[in-house]
Amino acid sequence: MVRGVYIQRASAEHMTVEAALRRYLREVTPTKRESTQAGEHKKAKALIQHLGRYSLAALNAELIAQFRDMRLAGDVDEKGKTIPRSNNTVRLELALLSHLFTVAIKEWGIGLPVNPVSNIRRPAPGAGRNRRLTKDEQKRLWSAVNAYSNPMFRWIVKIALETGMRLSEITTLRISQVDLDRRIVRLEHTKNSTPRTVPLTIQASQAFTEALDHPIRPPETDLIFFGEPGKDGKRRPYLFDKAWTDAKATAGLTDFRFHDLRHEAVSRFVEAGLSDQEVSAISGHKSMQMLKRYTHLRAEDLVAKLDRLKA
């Protein structure tokens, strides 16, 4: 009984978090973008591992707060190594869990008086990464990437570094989105839901040309970067997690993330003298505030310009 209203809790007591998440992945996740779907499956795996055994009725704010703190402090992997998770990773895991409860209460008729995730503190957003590649690191990375047998891996890394596109934007590209005559790529489905057109450098154009003209390309898919056919016969975006991990290890760059290639690309746009508006048009940053982490580059450039004024 909550505020004079009787709530039937039987369904919440019988459905586990694991069962609810698997239903969510079947019914809700497929309605989202492909890149979001992959991320939700990964987050659900962590939630199931740590909270899956509890019923929806039993999972309270205290247990969720313990999960939050444990993930931030670091849980032990299969090799016995403690791996802390970033604030943003934990925030996203909690966001998925929260939406699971919202859907269960509003759409599945699960009798719960409140979403328990709403009663806990979320980790503060982490500071933006500022990882850049040195010339020596880039040389080592390219040596490792070029040694990989599948050329799609090399093309994807090159395009990421030349264009600043996100991984999901690159791996889900269709042939119709690339116009090599005009040297542009049209992105319809982006992280911030705003379509944009990305200009291509000569190096990026060469990578796309090689990808589209390569004899390994099967005729039955319009994906530019494709994997092997699934059980249903369909090809899905190329996955190269292991290749990237191996390349980083070979290059001695274990702390370097694929998304850092985007930061490197945008930083180079700024260093090349592009205006904030031009950089935003290419990268898709929605506001000048989001580009602030790159402004220190402009400040350093201004020092030399100010010196020339006094000359």
Predicted regions mapped to residue ranges:
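Phosphate-coordinating loops and pocket residues in cytosolic domains that bind phosphorylated ligands
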Residues: 22, 58-61, 66, 73, ...
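N-terminal DNA-binding module of tyrosine recombinases/phage integrases
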Residues: 1-66, 220-221
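C-terminal catalytic core of tyrosine-transesterase DNA break-rejoin enzymes
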Residues: 88, 106, 158, 162-169, ...
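Catalytic-site neighborhood detector that most strongly recognizes the C-terminal catalytic loop/helix
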Residues: 132, 189-193, 276, 283-308
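C-terminal secondary-structure termini that scaffold catalytic or DNA-interacting sites
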Residues: 143, 182, 213-219, 227-231, ...
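Active-site/catalytic core of tyrosine-dependent DNA strand-transfer enzymes
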Residues: 136, 201-254
